[in-house]
From Swiss-Prot:
One of its GO terms (cellular component) is cytoplasm. Its EC number is 2.4.99.17. It comes from Exiguobacterium sibiricum (strain DSM 17290 / CCUG 55495 / CIP 109462 / JCM 13490 / 255-15). One of its GO terms (molecular function) is S-adenosylmethionine:tRNA ribosyltransferase-isomerase activity. Pathway: tRNA modification; tRNA-queuosine biosynthesis. This is S-adenosylmethionine:tRNA ribosyltransferase-isomerase. It catalyses: 7-aminomethyl-7-carbaguanosine(34) in tRNA + S-adenosyl-L-methionine = epoxyqueuosine(34) in tRNA + adenine + L-methionine + 2 H(+). Coiled coil: none annotated. Transfers and isomerizes the ribose moiety from AdoMet to the 7-aminomethyl group of 7-deazaguanine (preQ1-tRNA) to give epoxyqueuosine (oQ-tRNA). Its main location: cytoplasm. The gene is queA.
Length: 347
């Protein structure tokens, strides 16, 4: 399958640079995943599309202040570092800029030595494995020294760092936010639970690979980055009961979807599970774990728009994206949302 089949024209001015003041005031495009019929709403209207007995699956990962600015201890040369994922105690896969200055044995210092790191391996893809040393608790030191790693297409400074976190973020570990969740507020979640909707949290730590373009012409040849996930038994039980009782499972975001599909494919049912997943979902594959998906509008030719197309059809999704451009929707991380559902849109 040609990657160019997932291309579309997006005016640069429709890439959202800042979040809206009210998380729930973003536009919401409701799309019937089977017919392609669509309707324009506001995100706070999404409550009306849920029924008692449905379950909303949320990714409770928390974005780390993973961008660090420091120096080489030997020369004082400036280094920018981005933490990608933890591989063992105090050991992280990172991106260093400029990478050529960071070789095995190089020692880096951040915050006048409050945090130090030694390069232990240079990876083939340009990444660097670093072992950190510090006094106290690592994440407290990181909170003090690090800054939020915004996506490369966002050029504005983010005044309130919490706006790049979901209101239910709990588990530290992501290099990027699961952005579909940014639309929810505690009040909106309460309105859903008051209606009889259950929440099923899981964790998938989002890596920067989510922003990497597909570099091959043939979609089938693309290799996904791996990300760590956990589905707790408490949530797995809710999901099993939802299916048993005829309720719908609605995933918030592609990260929740990839986690559920990983568990279903590996275990055949919703069970407690954890590990690393590099699952790549694109048209031609059946998505078994969810009935609906809440997601943002994604980059052209990205693995994310391919996943969304797998839940519907490529033609329906590209039509919806053309409509979003025509209706001046805001795109990407701080942009508007789509709700893919089987609901008839003739009411």
């Amino acid at each position: 399958m040609d990657v160019n089949l997932f291309d579309f024209h997006l005016p640069e001015e429709q890439i959202a640079q800042v979040p809206l003041l009210d998380r729930t005031s973003s536009k919401l495009m409701v799309v019937n995943r089977e017919t392609g019929a669509l309707r324009h709403e506001k995100f706070h209207d999404i409550v009306s599309y849920f029924n008692a007995g449905d379950t909303l699956v949320i990714n409770d990962t928390k974005v780390l202040p993973a961008r660090l600015f420091g120096v080489k201890e030997e020369t004082g040369g400036k280094i920018e570092l981005l933490l990608l994922k933890q591989t063992s105690d105090d050991v992280w896969e990172t991106l260093a800029k400029p990478a050529k200055r960071v070789k095995p044995g190089t020692v880096l210092s951040f915050g006048d030595g409050l945090l130090r790191a030694e390069c232990v391996e240079a990876l083939d893809d340009g990444g660097r494995i670093l072992k950190f040393s510090y006094t106290g608790i690592f994440y407290e030191v990181l909170d003090q020294l690090g800054t939020m790693p915004l996506p490369p297409y966002i050029h504005e400074q983010l005044e309130d760092q919490d706006r790049y976190q979901t209101v239910y973020a709990r588990e530290r570990g992501s290099a990027a936010a699961p952005t579909a969740g940014l639309h929810f507020t505690p009040e909106l979640l309460q309105a859903l639970t008051d209606k009889g909707v259950q929440l099923a949290p899981l964790t998938l730590h989002v890596g920067l690979g989510t922003f990497r373009p597909v570099s091959v012409d043939d979609v089938d040849s693309h290799k996904m980055h791996s990300e760590y996930y956990e589905l707790p038994e408490s949530s797995a039980k809710i999901l099993r009961e939802t299916r048993k009782n005829g309720g719908r499972i609605i995933a918030v975001g592609t990260t929740s979807t990839r986690t559920l599909e990983t568990v279903i494919r590996d275990h055949g049912d919703f069970v407690e599970a954890s590990g690393w997943t590099d699952i790549f979902i694109y048209p031609g594959q059946e998505i078994k774990g969810i009935d609906g998906l809440i997601t943002n509008f994604h980059l052209p030719k990205s693995t994310l728009i391919m996943l969304v197309s797998a839940l519907s059809t490529r033609e329906h999704i590209l039509h919806a994206y053309e409509e979003a451009v025509a209706q001046n929707y805001r795109f990407f991380s701080f942009g508007d949302a789509m709700f893919l559902t089987r609901e008839e849109l003739n009411r």
